[in-house]
Amino acid sequence: MDKSKRPFRKSKRSFRKRLPPIGSGDRIDYRNMSLISRFISEQGKILSRRVNRLTLKQQRLITTAIKQARILSSLPFLNNEKQLERTESIPRTTGTRIRNK
């Protein structure tokens, strides 16, 4: 076949397979904060399986470990650092409220 007759054929490119984010020696545990923190977004949400590139079993173990760490207050439920900075800068008035009748 002539090359002009098959313009939509994909070229075969070599690609490097990425290493898995969890090694065989890593223990998925609620106390392993360095491992758990890799799978949480900046907002404190658990990242999806596609983003993490984990297997289904690994993702389940990571989610339960994150939830256990949250319950034991090792991890916050939400990352509210920006909200705390805003509320600290706003001056609050401490006085009695006057009701309009």
From Swiss-Prot:
Residue numbers spanned by region Disordered: 1-23
The organism's place on the tree of life at top rank: Eukaryota
Biased composition (Basic residues): 1-19
Subcellular location: Plastid, Chloroplast
MF (Gene Ontology): small ribosomal subunit rRNA binding; structural constituent of ribosome
SUPFAM superfamilies: Ribosomal protein S18
Major site of localization recorded for this protein: plastid
Record keywords, A-Z: Chloroplast, Plastid, Ribonucleoprotein, Ribosomal protein, RNA-binding, rRNA-binding
Coiled coil: none
Gene Ontology CC: one annotated term: chloroplast
UniProt record, GO biological process: translation
InterPro entries registered for this protein in UniProt: Ribosomal_bS18, Ribosomal_bS18_CS, Ribosomal_bS18_sf
Assembly and interaction partners: Part of the 30S ribosomal subunit.
Family that this chain belongs to: Belongs to the bacterial ribosomal protein bS18 family.
Protein name: Small ribosomal subunit protein bS18c
Lineage, broadest ranks: Eukaryota, Viridiplantae, Streptophyta, Embryophyta, Tracheophyta
Gene designation per UniProt: rps18
